[in-house]
Amino acid sequence: MSIDSALNWDGEMTVTRFDRETGAHFVIRLDSTQLGPAAGGTRAAQYSQLADALTDAGKLAGAMTLKMAVSNLPMGGGKSVIALPAPRHSIDPSTWARILRIHAENIDKLSGNYWTGPDVNTNSADMDTLNDTTEFVFGRSLERGGAGSSAFTTAVGVFEAMKATVAHRGLGSLDGLTVLVQGLGAVGGSLASLAAEAGAQLLVADTDTERVAHAVALGHTAVALEDVLSTPCDVFAPCAMGGVITTEVARTLDCSVVAGAANNVIADEAASDILHARGILYAPDFVANAGGAIHLVGREVLGWSESVVHERAVAIGDTLNQVFEISDNDGVTPDEAARTLAGRRAREASTTTATA
């Protein structure tokens, strides 16, 4: 992808920076501040070119705008991407500390128009480090006055989304269904446990062989990484990186439901159309995985109790039922229906704010 096409984006702001000493590129993209300051996690990963990092940040920021709106949260959408010069695990502590300090400086210069939190390859400890330089950070450790990890709340929301999608697809409950979980990290691992407790038969895959071995020891079945997208299952739960369902994959995916925690699971609109035409019911990711945003914004901005946050995460299932109702009534894909619902809620929130 060219840098020109990556910059052809309709969001509000793009901030980039390069650090010669570490070789890291920094990207912050603010998609919308209509409902409040933009918010979105910090993702650290390797990219083949800067254009890919810009595109990833833009897509993720857009998803955050939708996620905040559909969840009735008073924030906009943004995202940070740190394009690393080497795999995260190979970066020494002093280099990582410098990378985080520079990222915090970039955030602080935005003067509260953007807040960040943990994402791929960043955690609460990293948020504590960012907080040494800037106040505009979610997901700090409990010891630093933050809400801690949002992983379990995210998993709860995805689990409720999965149950709602399975029920709407006419499959009843998860009991006895085969669920393939791709990615056994903090969210995917918790989701797998919840699905197993509900009686699902689990197939699991992860790049981390220790995670897979642990799952197998619990009685689950491992699937080779190269076989994930061709293995038959009732429910496919992508919980790793996004973009896994391309048009080619959508034509051959052998499942009835797609409901996972990964962001931007569907690579493009055509893939969504193909899934819909084939009768594969997809839980739009920005609805299904909103539990993390609910946890961080609810606890650290709105002052919600743990019980209220949990209730709001469980209510993701109800939100999906509204999405499916719009999809059925209007004859559109669930993704289009979810965007319609997000737009409706954003307009309602804007009207309420304007008349308050």
Swiss-Prot record:
Self-association state and partner proteins as the record states: Homotetramer, dimer of dimers.
EC number: 1.4.1.20
Reaction catalysis annotation: L-phenylalanine + NAD(+) + H2O = 3-phenylpyruvate + NH4(+) + NADH + H(+)
Coiled coil: none
Chain positions recorded as NAD(+) binding sites: 43, 119, 150, 154, 183-189, 206-207, 211, 240-241, 261-263
Matching InterPro entries: Aminoacid_DH-like_N_sf (IPR046346), Glu/Leu/Phe/Val/Trp_DH (IPR006095), Glu/Leu/Phe/Val/Trp_DH_C (IPR006096), Glu/Leu/Phe/Val/Trp_DH_dimer (IPR006097), Glu/Phe/Leu/Val/Trp_DH_bac/arc (IPR016211), NAD(P)-bd_dom_sf (IPR036291)
Role played: Catalyzes the reversible NAD(+)-dependent oxidative deamination of L-phenylalanine to phenylpyruvate.
Pfam families xref list: ELFV_dehydrog, ELFV_dehydrog_N
Family: Belongs to the Glu/Leu/Phe/Val dehydrogenases family.
Activity-regulation annotation: Subject to competitive inhibition by 3-phenylpropionate for the conversion of L-phenylalanine to phenylpyruvate. Subject to competitive inhibition by D-phenylalanine for the conversion of phenylpyruvate to L-phenylalanine.
Any one GO BP annotation for this protein: L-phenylalanine biosynthetic process
Residues of the active site: K79
Keywords annotated in UniProt: NAD, Nucleotide-binding, Oxidoreductase
UniProt cross-references to Gene3D superfamilies, sorted A to Z: Leucine Dehydrogenase, chain A, domain 1, NAD(P)-binding Rossmann-like Domain
UniProt KW tRNA-binding keyword: no
Lineage: Bacteria, Bacillati, Actinomycetota, Actinomycetes, Mycobacteriales
Record-listed L-phenylalanine binding positions: K67, P118, D119, N263
CDD domains: NAD_bind_Leu_Phe_Val_DH
Pathway it works in: Amino-acid biosynthesis; L-phenylalanine biosynthesis; L-phenylalanine from phenylpyruvate (PDH route): step 1/1
Protein name, entry field: Phenylalanine dehydrogenase
Superkingdom of the source species: Bacteria
GO MF terms held by the record: nucleotide binding; phenylalanine dehydrogenase activity
